[in-house]
Amino acid sequence: MMRSHYCGALNRSHVGQTVTLSGWVHRVRNLGRFIFMQIRDREGIVQVFFDEKDEAIFKIASSLRSEACVQIQGEVIARDESQINKEMATGEIEVLVKNVVVYNNADVLPLDFNQNNTEEQRLKYRYLDLRRPEMAEKLKTRAKITSFVRRYMDDNGFLDIETPMLTKATPEGARDYLVPSRVHNGKFYALPQSPQLFKQLLMMSGFDRYYQIVKCFRDEDLRADRQPEFTQIDVETSFLTAEEVRELMENMIHGLWLDRLNVDLGKFPIMTWQEAMQRFGSDKPDLRNPLELVDVADILKDVEFKVFNEPANSADGRVTVLRVPNGASLTRKQIDEYTQFVGIYGAKGLAWAKINNVNAGMEGIQSPVAKFLNEEVFKALIERTNATSGDILFFGADKWQVVTDSMGALRLKVGRDLALTDLSAWKPLWVIDFPMFEKDDEGNLSAMHHPFTSPKNLTPEELAANPVNAVANAYDMVINGYEVGGGSVRIYDPKMQQTVFGILGINEQDQQEKFGFLLDALKFGTPPHAGLAFGLDRLTMLITGTENIRDVIAFPKTTAAACLMTEAPSFANPQALEELGIAVLKKEKAE
């Protein structure tokens, strides 16, 4: 027997028992007569000690380095009261070693387990990084999350059904990862960005409650919470309304937070996309932050200051104010830093006004734009924003999108900088009623979610007549400013689906070429259906309290979509490329 107990499972009830442990040497202290070691496995750490009286095993112990893989046999002993370590779960006991087997000693480590290592070091030697207790704990939590989800889905009548990994390239927003076919020369599979169409086809096949914990792939620019391959908790249902789907999924997340964190999330509030953008400058608002944007275009449309009056009188303009309580204490340097910050989002500047004394008229206001605004205007602004003495007002004035993006980002930054955001709180919500389409810089329409999302209460003819103002029957679950899941009611009428494709500029020939199988399937008694997908990586990131999604994935990629450990991607064998009919062209480096 290689193991009778996990290290972290030992406690006072095991005193007097002989145990067999297998794990790694975590730490060594040589005190001359005794050698103390901490032995670690995935469940925790326990202290063992070697007595010099047993010369043979004492000699072996003297040769062991940190991270050597060993088997320990010994007797569990209660520590003296003065020696109890309350910082360790196993701190009331230790193990007197009677025998030791060295499975493998360890070379000098390329990582220092007691210091912060660089991200590159951690990813290159990921198998060592994952031995660290804090990393092991995150992956254990991830496993428990998936276990909870599977139980919940099984209890609610969902079937776990797998969908293909090698599929057809369809336009879903990001670039596809392509896989060349050897048998069908010149043709390519795509790795799925999501199982979207297959799960809809399963609804058409009569499997009215489907789920899958599935890998998805997107060839897109990465950031801290994105990976080229990621895992979804994918869900689809037939004969359920959007409200019923949201209730089912809310109950699952509510139960998950209770199970993992003992936190009651309460009832999730529901907010429209329009309200979220107006009040918070984001479609995934962080409600832990009490700051809100207040629109003031009607107050500033007649002032003699073009920076304010032009966007205030423009159909695509916006003028808004962010009131920061006690913000009048901000220094000019801090304000300049915020001005630079909003510039990242396209803002040309950041006007501000300090309300030093709300009862002193213009004399109580300090602002570089005060000369353009009279006392009546400031009085209206103070009343609209509920400003009081000691507050500061930040102004955003430009095109609607620029103001919304820049002021929404400023709201988050100020909330964190000034400790206004309650980082200990959990604030979930549903965001609903998204626009069906969004315009790009050239005025072309694209689907805000995906082209299979149903509009809300519109016929195909009504949608075609006014697509810009169409509202999608879509919903996102947001927790603490992160979109953790998103879904919608799907189109189940072939005419509506063709109408949406047409609005997106997909002609009939391309519709048949790319989506002919779907359009055919829609003709044969397709049920109303709706679904949702959660990002498992992001859920785990939130529950474990990490801000880097790579910390909750066993073998993640870098932000350059590379694996430093295996050195993937790598060059392909020339013979394999020849069989595939592929020639690799070298790109000229830009000078």
UniProtKB/Swiss-Prot annotation:
Query: Which residues participate in L-aspartate binding?
Result: E172, R218, H449, R490
Q: Does the keyword Cell membrane apply?
A: no
- What molecular function does GO assign, one term? ATP binding
- Binding-site list for ATP: R218, D219, E220, Q227, E483, G535, L536, D537, R538
**Stretch forming the signal peptide:** none
Q: What is its main location?
A: cytoplasm
Report the locations given in the UniProt record. Answer: Cytoplasm
A Pfam entry, by short name: GAD
- GO biological process terms held by the UniProt record: aspartyl-tRNA aminoacylation
The family database entries (HAMAP family) matched by this protein are listed as: Asp_tRNA_synth_type1 (MF_00044)
**Quaternary structure and interacting proteins, as annotated:** Homodimer.
The job of this chain, per UniProt, is described as: Catalyzes the attachment of L-aspartate to tRNA(Asp) in a two-step reaction: L-aspartate is first activated by ATP to form Asp-AMP and then transferred to the acceptor end of tRNA(Asp).
- NCBIfam families per record: aspS_bact, PRK00476.1
Write down what this protein is called.
Aspartate--tRNA ligase
Its source organism is: Actinobacillus pleuropneumoniae serotype 5b (strain L20)
